């Protein structure tokens, strides 16, 4: 099937002053735009419990942003920045952060022209001892490189990044990361290291707000999707259908699948990363239905979900997945996805409501919003621009209700 998406239809003027460069003093003090059946209202994020349907299940992405930027130097003194994207060997995230002595990662290299051979290093002191971290390029893939790290300190790679690395805030903030970003560019429920960008819809939640919502009967579950740098890649082709989606790794627990099935029809995804994770489950379930296995080692393709029969419902998908995990004795399922959710007749199977920030013009995230609300996305963004809403990662939020 030939697909075409004119990306110019998803453009709008976003003045730089409307991009939130820093977070508000209080997470839940942000504004909340409410879209309900074509009607727009304005609330505070702290009041989201008054907006969502009673008893709704909210699904968080509990990934944690790593300090992925490491500034190193050549022996000549040249400054080289190594941006760790995802583990290469060991490739498993948990093992990659627990390893000691050495590992390899897929990275972006800043000032590459000054690093043609040899190693770069950073010297540091730990526990009164002089230590060093060194890095070599072992594979050149153009934009990305496989980099070998070796270090002397008795530390895991996760501890090393925490000690030496810097938080990779979005490039459109046009500033260096600061101390405030170490805490505020993380959700309060972040647990598992692996992301190089935050699932920003969740930045508005506080422990107090979550506690209040639980007391009112709202339920919460978590999935893990490690957000890659590809989330910031603009759609450069005038036909967005030719845009190659980035791959992101995700994980879901059997208990979460069971809860999703129990609450099907009342599921609110907090953020586009939660949307992509939940919707990708339908592809794994269809593989089980048709081939007896989710084939989790094979990436969920960019258009795979569009080829699944419309009558295969989200409830059926969750039943298939739950049954398979129970039969196989799997407590959790790991997979990867390149799913691209667009207005090309995409059928949302798992997600019923979405909490999300305001996204960049001509972005795949804006296509996802359009897939959910149709042409109403422009009314939403016109309202937000006209009523003082702050945009992008540190900006305000919206809740999109299908009612």
Provide a role label for each language-model segment.
Residues 1-403:
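Surface-exposed, charge/polar-rich loops and edge strands
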């Amino acid at each position: 099937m030939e697909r075409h998406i004119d990306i110019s239809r998803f453009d709008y003027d976003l003045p730089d002053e409307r991009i939130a460069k820093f977070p508000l003093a209080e997470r839940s003090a942000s504004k909340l735009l409410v879209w309900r059946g074509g009607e727009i209202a304005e609330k505070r994020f702290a009041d989201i419990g008054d907006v969502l349907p009673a008893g709704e299940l909210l699904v968080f992405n509990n990934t944690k942003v790593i300090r992925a930027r490491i500034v190193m130097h050549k022996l000549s003194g040249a400054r080289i920045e190594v941006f760790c994207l995802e583990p290469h060997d060991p490739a498993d995230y948990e093992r990659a952060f627990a390893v000691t002595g050495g590992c390899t990662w897929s990275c972006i290299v800043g000032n590459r022209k000054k690093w043609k051979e040899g190693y770069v290093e950073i010297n540091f002191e730990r526990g009164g001892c002089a230590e060093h971290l060194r890095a070599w390029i072992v594979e050149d893939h153009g934009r990305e490189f496989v980099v070998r790290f070796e270090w002397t300190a008795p530390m895991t790679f996760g501890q090393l990044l925490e000690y030496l690395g810097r938080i990779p805030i979005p490039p459109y903030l046009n500033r260096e990361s600061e101390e405030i970003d170490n805490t505020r560019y993380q959700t309060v429920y972040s647990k598992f290291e692996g992301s190089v960008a935050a699932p920003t819809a969740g930045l508005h939640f506080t422990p107090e707000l979550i506690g209040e919502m639980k007391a009112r009967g709202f339920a919460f579950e978590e999935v893990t999707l490690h957000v890659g740098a590809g989330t910031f890649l603009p759609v450069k082709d005038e036909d967005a259908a030719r845009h190659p989606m980035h791959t992101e790794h995700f994980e879901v627990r059997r208990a979460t699948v069971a809860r999703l099935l129990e609450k099907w029809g009342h599921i609110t995804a907090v953020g586009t990363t939660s949307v992509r994770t939940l919707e990708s489950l339908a592809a794994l379930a269809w593989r089980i239905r048709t081939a007896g296995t989710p084939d989790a080692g094979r990436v969920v393709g960019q258009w795979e979900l569009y080829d699944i029969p419309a009558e295969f419902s989200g409830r059926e998908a969750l039943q298939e997945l739950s049954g398979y995990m129970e039969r196989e004795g799997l407590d959790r399922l790991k997979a990867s996805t390149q799913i691209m959710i667009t207005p090309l007749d995409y059928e949302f199977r798992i997600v019923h409501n979405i909490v999300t920030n305001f996204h960049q013009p001509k972005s795949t995230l804006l296509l996802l919003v359009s897939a959910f609300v149709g042409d109403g996305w422009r009314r939403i963004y016109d309202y937000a621009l006209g009523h003082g809403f702050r945009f992008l990662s540190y900006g305000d939020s919206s809740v999109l209700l299908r009612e």
